[in-house]
């Protein structure tokens, strides 16, 4: 009969992860809006980043897990999220080290944010190249998604009429738009990181 596969389980796992990321970015966007209203100085890009990420999450949740486009997109997305997780661990390590140093110097308390001064630290020499590498991969992934799925966008089939359930047009179009958003996110992250680096 049919071959046993982990794809439905893996695809469902990815969709659960995307649902969690959707919740995460929604809660962060709400929190940052409150912080801005209370006078925090948060770069406008990061607020926009979270709203764009919410849109990407919603798009990803609409894709059927058994489609070829989802399989193609899911592999790259998993690798990107693993890399993103490693960068978050590095950022946390860096921030904790900075805060520990500032507490030891008597410049901060445990509840302060570690980036209060503009002096560069040695941990940035590792953090920034890894961030740039992640952003380059995000741009590459967005470009690949656009190139491989642009044909589905150009196809007149299925825009105003019904198309067969076996067709992968809807998923391919979704992946195309996710690719566009990935490029926007990658470029925004890159320029925001450069602005932060120049400010230090």
Where are these regions (language model features)?
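Eukaryotic polytopic
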Residues: 1-200
């Amino acid at each position: 009969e049919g071959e046993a596969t982990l794809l439905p389980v893996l695809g469902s796992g990815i969709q659960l992860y995307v649902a969690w990321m959707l919740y995460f970015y929604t809660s962060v966007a709400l929190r940052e809006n409150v912080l801005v209203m209370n006078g925090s100085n948060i770069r406008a890009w990061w607020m926009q980043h979270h709203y764009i990420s919410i849109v990407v999450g919603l798009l990803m949740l609409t894709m059927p897990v058994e489609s070829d486009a989802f399989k193609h997109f899911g592999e790259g997305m998993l690798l990107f999220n693993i890399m993103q997780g490693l960068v978050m661990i590095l950022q946390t390590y860096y921030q904790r080290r900075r805060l520990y140093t500032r507490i030891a110097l008597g410049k901060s308390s445990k509840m302060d944010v570690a980036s209060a001064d503009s002096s560069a630290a040695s941990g940035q020499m590792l953090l920034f190249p890894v961030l740039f590498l992640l952003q380059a991969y995000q741009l590459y992934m967005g470009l690949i998604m656009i190139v491989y799925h642009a044909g589905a966008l150009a196809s007149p089939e299925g825009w105003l009429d019904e198309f067969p359930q076996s067709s992968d047009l809807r998923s391919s179009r979704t992946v195309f738009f996710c690719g566009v958003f990935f490029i926007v996110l990658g470029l925004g992250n890159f320029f925001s990181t450069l602005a932060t680096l120049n400010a230090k």
